[in-house]
Amino acid sequence: MESSRVVVGGGLPLANRRNSSFAKPKIQQGTFLPLSRINNVSAPQKCSLHTNPNPMFPFVTRRKSQTNPDCGVVKLGEEDDSCSSLDKLPEVNGVHTGVARPVDIKRELVMLSLPAIAGQAIDPLTLLMETAYIGRLGSVELGSAGVSMAIFNTISKLFNIPLLSVATSFVAEDIAKIAAQDLASEDSQSDIPSQGLPERKQLSSVSTALVLAIGIGIFEALALSLASGPFLRLMGIQSMSEMFIPARQFLVLRALGAPAYVVSLALQGIFRGFKDTKTPVYCLGIGNFLAVFLFPLFIYKFRMGVAGAAISSVISQYTVAILMLILLNKRVILLPPKIGSLKFGDYLKSGGFVLGRTLSVLVTMTVATSMAARQGVFAMAAHQICMQVWLAVSLLTDALASSGQALIASSASKRDFEGVKEVTTFVLKIGVVTGIALAIVLGMSFSSIAGLFSKDPEVLRIVRKGVLFVAATQPITALAFIFDGLHYGMSDFPYAACSMMVVGGISSAFMLYAPAGLGLSGVWVGLSMFMGLRMVAGFSRLMWRKGPWWFMHTSDKRLA
């Protein structure tokens, strides 16, 4: 969903120490170049290489592929020939800079995207399986579960996406600070290179994220359980509706898993801060495989219906959270010795803009579901099928956006604007190709896919009308997600939040009135408008000459 967008910390890159007095500056402890310092730059700054022990940008480079699998901290090593390393760096006016350019942007992007795609695909695919199993129970069950899922996602993800993004950034910054401190200590004592974080560390960012996740999860569970009736009525499901009882039962049971769900998302952000994307994928795979195994057992074998589906999901969520906590406990101390070491203020401040943006997205999607529910049982069931397929496929492009975001954040923190331009251009091209490919595949197979979710002829008839919405909008959706990732990589959170509020307001207003004359098609047109306006807003920001993307309109020579 929206998928969550990941912000990589803007810490100063660690680097290889050299056997040359010319290329061995003393790294100042805790020196970093956050993205916020370059976000509103209007012109490039020139810098030269000199022997000043306190240069503006210490002359440091990063060894290729030398990462610690345990925590993602760069390992330092010796270079036999500092002069040969100088040749590998780009030049500024004939002088080597301290910015190491990626050897192969395309390969690096692909390697980052593969685990991200796997992680993004697991939850939506499991949700598709759940929808398919529930759909075989009947249209009433499918429609009621669809409304309850929308409510659960709206409430639970309201704070989850900001928490995930901010946790990633803060954890990465904490790791970089500790590594810099260790390096400074070693420089004053010996020539033995740092090996990252070999032992458990106390990271306030990790502890704060976990405490916030637990508190938010408990609050969400209570809110969803105690206010299930009002939430359903707000979505258009009245007490006399045949969908009310199964929808309320499903929502109350799913609420029990809210704490685990929030904690697991926060843990994913923490592991990404450690630059470890494999561990979350393994844990998500185990938990979701368990859910897929339990769905038919509880729904059909034990004849629990939608309640069985909800219980299966709750068991899966707690399994994922527990596995991640066990593995994280091997790396860091989970809870701080004193409450004063937690930094709630930093989290709340940094997550404010992301929260506003997330709220705008969720409100728009909630309006769409609410207006679809008002069209009747068959229309709501068809809308649920279209939405699940659309979200599951479009989230795959979100993984590409997250990978591009990571590369952009890394290059921008080093003021490597040529690298940012290269990543941006390549990611946008891949986004267009991916969107067109998905549109073709879905256009040819969507009718067959719909049959997996329901056998009701009336539901299938309505679903076939949604082919244009699901398939044709894929190129637009792909670019909308990618633009979000690009702006997050440049830490352009204010624009991301404000533009989303405007886009969401326009789309929601359209969907509130269009269904009166267009029916369910009015909802789908409104959602297509939502993604189209997001794409336009993202592209417009890229074209601003005085914004954070000023360098996109500057020649390579001027950047140099």
UniProtKB/Swiss-Prot annotation:
Keywords: Chloroplast, Membrane, Plastid, Transit peptide, Transmembrane, Transmembrane helix, Transport. The keyword Membrane applies. The gene is DTX45. Signal peptide: none annotated. This is Protein DETOXIFICATION 45, chloroplastic. Its main location: plastid. It is found in: Plastid, Chloroplast membrane. Pfam families: MatE. Ubiquitous. Belongs to the multi antimicrobial extrusion (MATE) (TC 2.A.66.1) family. One of its GO terms (cellular component) is chloroplast. CDD domains: MATE_DinF_like. Induction: Not induced by aluminum. NCBIfam families: matE.
